[in-house]
């Protein structure tokens, strides 16, 4: 009996070696089907899934590290991962990523480093952004650069260069990329990338104005609030694409001129000298300032007489600059900055209507024909207006063009009177000659009438 037992135990040790037993014990539980996995009761705490997730027991045990697993083919599996194919966790296809795909535009969530992930099926080259400030130090991520490149692909080269120049300027004045966009409802705080994304680059462009001022550190009474003040966001306006490209070309020309001057170009130095002389000449011209809050009565009477004395007085100049500003301290401020506490925008609308009325009244005064002034304007009603007014050259001291026209009319009247006198004398002479000479045709008529009467009488007598 003992011999028989030994013979039975001997072959069994071949099939159950220590290695196979170790593998069998350490092998995790794998259900045969999803339905079987759901119906099977949960047991053995190390194989139970996490609470609130739909991960399989195997994913629970080995973790949910997407970067470790790599792709769905299972080529980059861990040391303890023996199963391949469908059992390997897929990239961007687990529970944590699926919950964020709808809110993130279909791109992977932040746990896969989505800030630097490029959009799918994207064949764009962003290497030409390498020298731009906004492409460095994480100001614009790679994904943002891909989106920006896709937007700029449909525009012209000059438009692309202008927008890149504005974005480089924005790096220094808006570190977090947030700006105040001027809309019909007032200022709207938004990211600059959304502003560019919503532009029609065939018609629309942008302009950036920095609002670096220290007025917020003081109250209306003049008391100091303190050093901790919120930094002001730059103001962005939607403008025609032609104006944006023109402003960029002018700025580029200035930079090129400075570069030529630094290289010692004589031609550039002469042009700079001419510009400085014209600027000094313009600064020596007389100027007068009106505020937007002026009353219509003062504007039409007192201020208008002051303007006429500047141009037509004994010591008047040939040119005067008229400034329409908010006040002396806030001459360059926008109406949106002055009434920034107006949430509904009602004060801004009323102020803009009043400024339009002041502008219309001033231009009606300048277009007076009796004065004969010529003028040009720069700026807008949102910030300030500058009128350059010149008077026409006149002859004979301070006579205006109206007096010259009056003398021409008087001269024409005297010439006409002389012509009428000559014609009247000629007509009177011809009438006197006609009265002095006899009229033979009248006598012949009388003779004919007498002969006819005699013939008529003789005819009656014969009867």
UniProtKB/Swiss-Prot annotation:
Task: Report biased composition (Low complexity) as residue ranges.
Answer: 94-114
Where is the region Disordered? 25-124, 208-229, 391-449
Q: Which UniProt keywords apply?
A: Mitochondrion, Transit peptide
Where are stretches of biased composition, namely Basic and acidic residues?
Answer: 213-224, 406-423, 440-449
InterPro entries per the record?
A: AIM23
**Where's it found, cell-wise?**
Mitochondrion
FT transit peptide: 1-69
Pfam families tied to this protein: mIF3
Q: A single GO CC term, please?
A: mitochondrion
Q: Where is the composition biased (Polar residues)?
A: 48-79, 391-405
Give the family per the record.
Belongs to the AIM23 family.
Return the protein name: Altered inheritance of mitochondria protein 23, mitochondrial
